[in-house]
Structures are given as structure tokens and as C-alpha cells.
């Protein structure tokens, strides 16, 4: 794709793109959010500049000299108020009421990201959720659906607007950390059932929003607390979103300015 093209810069988060950019004398900028990743040092070495998309980095972490902390999380690029507008009409397909249902996500542990994680984390805590509470179930291994409570609503994915379903939920429980972070940035109380407790991005999402895990609060207490906040959730949600928007940089404006600098 780069052959015989006059490219001034590239933006990616991968080793191959950065390597190709170097070959074609193009300045590679990279975006990463996990300085624990095995590819982090390689990506940073190949970069002209590497943006570490974390609101803050723990003192125990030593970043690469080319790394610049960008005060945001990557999910904010598509969840910021200037970009994402929740659509309440998506709830009609499921006959659910705003802030009166839970969204749960069960990831497959067959991938490299979750290889060391216990399988069926959501299934193991399903009985703790009140039987009269509507639940939307996002399930990667859909062949296991019959093992979950039959009154739970199985989502037929991919969905056109999954983030609106998360936004209007009373809370989200996920065995994967990506969707737990998304919920937190949407101002939705979230609970992460996985094991990546020390990942900086998860710590940031917990600090600026509401993300708990098995080390910070029991799932029983979280369910009780979340259900007790249903009445006040819309107001609290907007306060959280506004607070995050003040703390995080505008990623789109930042990247636009970066690109225009190379056009001058």
C-alpha cells in the first residue's frame, strides 16, 4: 500500500505498519494502551513517537523514551460526548426499560488474551442476579446459551448499536476488560470478572468512572449497590461523563492537529 506513495506519516498500533513506514522513510506514530504487552518495546523502538493512551501511568512502570502519555483511553475516541449519542430507540427491540436491566458479557477464554482465565465466569455468578431483573446477554460461545438462565435475552451479534444498550443499562458485568472499560467511560457501573487487575487502562477506568473487580468489591455487594442506585443513575451518569470529558484530551482534535502539522 505504501509503494510509490509520498507518505509523510503513519499512525498505527502495530509492528508491521511501523516497520513498513521506516522502510519507506515515513514517520511512524503509534498508539498503545498496554505497556505490559510483549510488543510494546518493539513498537516504541520503531516509532517516531509513541503515544501511550493512559490518563496516568503507575510510578512502577518505566515507559520507553519515545513514549508520550496521552491523557485519555483509546475507547474515548468513540465514546466521548462529542462523538457518541445514545439512541434510546434500540431498547424497543428487547422490551426493556432504561436503567432497569443489566448487561452481561461472557468472553471466550480460548483466545490468547484470556487463555489463563477461568471459563464461564458469568455463568458461575448468574444465580446471584435477581430472577426478576431483565438481563441482556452478550455471549461469544453462543452454543452454551441453554446453560444460562432462560429468561436472559441473548443478543444476536454483531449489533448496530451495542453502546446504547450498555449506556441505558443499570450496570454491566463482564468477564472481559474491554467492555468493562467502555461501560465505565459511559458512566455505567461495571464489574470485571477477569484477572487483569494490574492493567493500567483498567485502573484508569476505575479512577475516572466506576469499574470494580473481585479485589475491590464482592460481586454480591456490587449487585446490591448497583440495583439500589437505579433511580439516581441518569444524573450520576451525566456527572461522570462530564467529569471524564474535562480530564481527557480530545483525541480527534489531537490527531487532527498532528496530521495538519505534517501537511505544512
Model region roles, listed by residue range:
Residues 104, 126-156:
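Catalytic donor nucleotide-activated moiety binding site of glycosyltransferases and closely related
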Residues 9-20, 28-32, 164-202:
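A donor-sugar binding/catalytic signature common to diverse glycosyltransferases
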Residues 49-117:
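A nucleotide-sugar donor-handling region in carbohydrate enzymes
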Residues 13-16, 53-59, 138-146, 196-198:
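Short, polar loop motifs at secondary-structure junctions
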Residues 232-264:
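C-terminal amphipathic helix plus adjacent low-complexity
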Residues 1, 142-179:
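Donor nucleotide-activated moiety binding/catalytic core segment of transferases
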Residues 185-230:
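Catalytic binding pocket for nucleotide-activated donors in carbohydrate/polymer assembly enzymes
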Residues 1-63:
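Active-site and donor-binding regions of nucleotide-sugar-utilizing enzymes
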